[in-house]
């Protein structure tokens, strides 16, 4: 490890809790390395390790300032079980309290307990990534990157009285490095639309959306070049995978993608996006892609509502409750944002911009103001100052 400060990052990812914790922690880790810190990931099992390494570039795997360690006594859903091992690890090689307290320990787990945090406090500076507000966390640094309307900010601040310092709001969103400092321009016409449901699509949204798209927009006789291209991101657990690829062969304006390595580049080619709520909304926000969201799981409801309340990303509703209404609202959004639906000037030489272009430009600026892609570096700088 390097001579600068060492940060331990305790997190996990597996088929039960997905990979979101690993992805956002890796983004923070990469920025910690930029600041001169060394990083040690502490994981529960080989599954978490394999998942983490699948997100790492070869150069990152070879970086001597980053290491990955499996805890022998850990269970991802029972953190207190590992306490003796973690305390021994954090205390090893230190002869004084000042040396011990120079450790930085970032935790990202929904299975945190007050006892776990309190037990570690004497041997490290503790930081915690939160989005559930389970209790008032006794930590040195609390990070919650929810989209928080001004009216809700006081209640968030009141919920974290035991934290010595609190970082609140979307400015602290830890996005993947591919989204850092990336900008896109708003085109005059809508020619490309991104559609994504995340890793799975249990309610067959993509298939329903495409059927509606073909029926409503791809009307018989309409020139193919005037139809926006649909870019469908096919998650690894999508049960309709084969059907979606078949539709891509049948219709030239439908393209399906799987295992996308540079999502920022794909998003950057699109003028509009339709997305299930979740981390993807923050990524689209950072690029300024006008987006409409929908929900299909309980843990997506709060995020979708928060984006909707700020006016940044409207939510069409919950696909589980009223599929037809949700899809109709999504098409209303596409119409509103597409030039085809505007009443344009009768003068073909007019350089007046379309109303839909102005709406997309306004949305782009609003989204970029909310999430700029530098959240992980802001967190890294705060961790180094602990």
Predicted regions and their residues:
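Donor-nucleotide binding loops and adjacent catalytic segments primarily
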Residues: 187-270
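C-terminal alpha-helical cap of glycosyltransferases
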Residues: 372-386
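Acidic donor-binding loop of glycosyltransferase active sites
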Residues: 268-279
């Amino acid at each position: 490890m390097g001579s600068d400060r060492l940060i331990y990052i305790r997190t996990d990812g597996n088929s039960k809790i997905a990979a979101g914790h690993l992805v956002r922690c890796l983004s923070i880790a990469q920025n910690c390395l930029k600041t001169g810190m060394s990083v040690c990931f502490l994981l529960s099992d080989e599954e978490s390790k394999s998942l983490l390494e699948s997100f790492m570039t070869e150069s990152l795997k070879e970086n001597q300032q980053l290491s990955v360690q499996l805890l022998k006594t850990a269970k991802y859903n029972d953190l207190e079980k590992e306490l003796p091992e973690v305390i021994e690890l954090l205390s090893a090689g230190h002869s004084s309290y000042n040396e011990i307290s120079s450790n930085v320990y970032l935790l990202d787990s929904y299975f945190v307990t007050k006892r776990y945090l309190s037990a570690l406090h004497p041997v490290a500076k503790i930081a915690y990534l939160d989005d559930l507000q389970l209790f008032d966390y006794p930590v040195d640094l609390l990070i919650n990157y929810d989209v928080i309307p001004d009216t809700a900010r006081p209640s968030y601040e009141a919920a974290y009285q035991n934290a010595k310092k609190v970082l609140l709001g979307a400015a602290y969103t830890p996005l993947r490095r591919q989204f850092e400092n990336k900008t896109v321009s708003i085109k005059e016409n809508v020619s490309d639309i991104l559609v994504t449901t995340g890793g799975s699509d249990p309610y067959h949204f993509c298939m329903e959306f495409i059927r509606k798209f073909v029926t409503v927009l791809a009307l018989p006789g309409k020139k193919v070049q005037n139809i926006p291209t649909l870019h469908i991101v096919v998650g690894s657990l999508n049960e309709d995978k084969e059907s979606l690829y078949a539709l891509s062969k049948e219709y030239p304006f439908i393209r399906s993608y799987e295992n996308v390595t540079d999502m920022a580049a794909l998003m950057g080619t699109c003028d509009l996006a339709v997305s299930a709520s979740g981390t993807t909304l923050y990524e689209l926000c950072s690029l300024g892609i006008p987006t409409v969201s929908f929900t299909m799981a309980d843990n997506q409801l709060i995020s979708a509502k928060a984006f909707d309340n700020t006016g940044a990303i409207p939510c069409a509703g919950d696909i589980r409750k009223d599929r037809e209404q949700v899809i109709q609202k999504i098409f209303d959004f596409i119409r509103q944002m597409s030039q085809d639906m505007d009443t344009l000037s009768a003068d073909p030489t007019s350089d007046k911009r379309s109303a839909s272009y102005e709406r997309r430009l306004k949305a782009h600026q609003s989204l970029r103001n909310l999430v700029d892609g530098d959240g992980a570096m802001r967190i890294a700088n705060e961790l180094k100052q602990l």
